[in-house]
Amino acid sequence: FRNGFTAEVRRALVRCFEQYNAAITDYHRALQEAAGQTPSKTGPLRWFYAEGEDPTAYDQAPGFERLAHTVPANQTLAVAMTSAEHKLATGFYDFTVFALSDWKAERKRGLDGLAFSVPRAFLLHRPAVFQAMFNAFAEALPTVHGHAGFAVNVPPMDRRPNEASEYFYARRFGPGIDVGDPMRSNVRKLFTKIKTVDWLNALDADLVREVGGASSLVLPPDWFIREPLKNGGLLIQAGAAPESGISNGPGKPVVPPAAYVLLNQALRPIVADKLDTLQDGTLDSTAPLLSTVVATEGWLHRFNVPEDQLNLWWVELHKTPKVTDERTAIAEQTRKLLERMGLPVEPRS
C-alpha cells in the first residue's frame, strides 16, 4: 500500500490491527474454554518489536496505536507483534507493519507493507473471518497489491538463520507455500508487478487494466470469487481453501494447486518473472535457499505451464471443491467488518 506516513493511513492501520486483535483474542479465548481453562483477559500476542528498540513483552509495550500516532512522518514506522513464547522465537499469530518515511516514499523507495497471520485451524473454526479481514484491510488502505495463503512464520529478529527451514517446508509441502520476507525491499519495489498469485489476491485498478480489465479474466465463479476493490481494483479468491500443493505420488514433486495455476495464467502479464533474491541465508549456511537470482526466478515461475497443457489443469480444477457455499458468508463477514471499521459498505455478490 501507499502513503503509510500520513495520519489518515496510520489511523486505518490502527483500525486494521484492532479488528485483527479482536478476532484472534476471541478465538484464543474460545480455545481456552474448549480446553476447560479459564479464558485469559488478554489475547495470544506476547512480544512487541519496534524499530530501534529491544523486544518488549506485549503487555508492557507502548502499543501499536501509540506508535502509529507518535512516530513522525519523516521516520519509518516498523512494528511487529507476535504470539511467540520467547522474543527470539516465532508464533502462529503475527501482525507486522512497515511504512516508509515521507521522503523515502516521495523518492519511490518502495511500497509500504502489512502482513498478518493466523494458524490454519483458525480458518476451520472461524469460517470466512480471515477472508473478510483480507478484503476489509485491502479496502481500508490505499492498496496496490496483496496476497494471502500458506506461509511459514519465522522469528522477526532472526530471519536469516531460519530461512533454510522456510525453504524446506516449501519444498516439502508444495509450491503453494509462500517464501521470503513480505517486507523485503525488492518485493516492496514491485509497483507494476506482483510477486505471486495465491489463495487470496488484491489488485489495484492499474494492475487490473494491465491484464485487460476484470471482464477479460476467465475465472469460473464456481471456483473463483471476484469482488470489486475500491476505484476499479479487484479481489480474487482462488479455490475454496488455501492449498500448498497436490501429492503426485511417492518420490515425485508436489503438483501446484490447479486454481493457482489457472489464476497465474490469467494474471501472467503482471506476475513478476524476475526479481533479486528472495532469501539471503547466513555466511556458513550450506542448505539450499532462494539466495540466487536463478533459484528465485525458478520459484517465481513455479505456476507457469505450457499453453498446450492448460486444458489438463481445467480438468483438475473441476475435481476441487466449489466456492459457492461460502460466497455469502464471506460477503456478510466482510460487510460486518467494514461497518465496524467505519468504512463504506458496497453490495457484494
Q: Model-derived features: where do they sit?
A:
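C-terminal interaction module
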Residues: 1-38, 156-349
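Internal, hydrophobic cores of structured domains that mediate oligomerization or house catalytic pockets
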Residues: 36-170
